[in-house]
Amino acid sequence: MAEPPVPILMYHAVATDPNDATRVLSVSPEAFARQMEIVAESGCTPVRTADLAARWRDGRPLPARPVLITFDDGYEGVHRHALPVLAKHGYPATVFVSTGWIRGAYDTGGGLDTMLDWDQVRELAAADVEIGGHTHTHPQLDQLDDSALRHELIHSREIVTDEVGTAPVSLAYPFGYSSRRVREAARESGYGQALAVNNALARRRQGPYALTRLTVRRATTAEEFERLVQGRAIARDFARDRALTKGYALVRRARQVRRKVSRSRV
């Protein structure tokens, strides 16, 4: 019998009044609370990213109706608004932090809104939240040369290890972009699994370094969210996203070709 696919939910900011840069991919605290109620009502079992990957890697069975709750970048509202709701339900989650965006000694000033500080990251880790890597400056990894790529992966992993006390084993690719070269670099940098986007259900056959996620945004209705966690009508709900993604992929490939030609002439 084939293993059922798993919905991996991708959140960003949880905020009452997000700024323009984060609004579309944010959710309100009230919406997040309702969404977690839907997870409970649907009989789903939240698991952390590392736990899902380990079960698939070892061939162990998954819990009933597994779902992953993940947050990218490291916005302060994850601690302020999401953590109390997660704690209320006893749900584990994964937060993927861009270390150069977290407030503190390594802050590059690139954060798009109010970000977590390292004390808050440690409090999340102590509350059954897996802290994953999301690079240092949030670049498009497949557009970097080998040296810059490895620096982004290794430097950010070292910072999380120093600040949290545990090396991150899960990675989320910024913007969801990767390539065979990026996935190999992630493995060599010490990550055991990595998440993309693609707005599709995750399946074991995707491999540990290309697990797909589902975007939860401010426009996601309760009915749409229920379909996400139940794995229904995914292609229909994300049809527009996929069309835009395909178009942008052509643009990005053209840019890569131009860069390769330019480097070959140097």
Task: Annotate each predicted stretch with a short phrase.
Residues S26-P61, T161-E163, R187-P208, K246-V266:
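C-terminal domain-boundary segment and adjacent tail
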